[in-house]
């Protein structure tokens, strides 16, 4: 079961988790610019490659590559048939928890079950992202998202 979250929302949330844990002190904008620079030189330096077995995406504060879902899904599709993977989105889940849970139970061939306590835990509140940074991220993720949409057979509204 795969639960996808809009990559921009995901990295913004992840940034604030790291910041609140005292692991990140730079501004979000600086963090994104620095990672984009690391990605540019990553092919030249093995320690910055995600496929390096020594790469630890938490230690390396890897925000952008962490959300390249198409890359990860392609790996899983080499091991599993597409019908063996249920792909959900965080937006669908938040819009209709009961429907998403029913879909999940059906996929797992389990009887439907009503969950009583469906409130959200650990909900973070963050300042609004700068528009220039959001545009930079939309542009960065667009080709990755387009590849994902082809793999899952549907378009999501993440490229806005």
What positions do the PLM features span?
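Short C-terminal domain-edge/linker segments immediately following a structured domain
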Residues: 4-6, 31-36, 116-120
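Charged, low-complexity, helix-prone segments enriched in Lys/Glu/Asp/Gln
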Residues: 10-18, 34-35, 134, 138-145
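PAPS-dependent sulfation machinery
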Residues: 16-61
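The conserved 3'-phosphoadenosine-5'-phosphosulfate
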Residues: 64, 74-147, 153-160
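Active-site glycine-rich loop that binds ribose-phosphate moieties when present
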Residues: 71
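Short aromatic-enriched loop/helix-cap "lid" or pocket-rim segments at secondary-structure transitions
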Residues: 11-16, 22-23, 98-101
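Acceptor-substrate binding/catalytic loop of class I
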Residues: 60-68
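Conserved phosphate-donor/acceptor-positioning beta-strand/loop module used by diverse small-molecule
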Residues: 1-13
């Amino acid at each position: 079961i795969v639960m996808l979250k809009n990559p921009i929302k995901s990295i913004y949330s992840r940034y604030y988790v790291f910041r609140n844990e005292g692991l990140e002190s730079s501004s979000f904008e600086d963090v994104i610019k620095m990672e984009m620079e690391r990605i540019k030189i990553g092919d030249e330096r093995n320690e910055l490659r995600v496929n390096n077995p020594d790469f630890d995406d938490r230690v390396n504060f890897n925000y952008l590559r962490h959300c390249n879902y198409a890359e990860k899904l392609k790996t899983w599709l080499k091991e599993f048939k597409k019908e063996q993977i249920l792909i959900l989105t965080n937006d669908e889940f938040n819009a209709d928890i009961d429907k998403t849970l029913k879909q999940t139970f059906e996929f797992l061939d389990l009887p439907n079950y009503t969950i009583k306590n469906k409130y959200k835990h650990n909900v973070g509140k963050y300042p609004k992202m700068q528009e220039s940074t959001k545009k930079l991220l939309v542009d960065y993720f667009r080709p990755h998202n387009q590849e994902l949409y082809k793999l899952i057979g549907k378009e999501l509204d993440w490229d806005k």
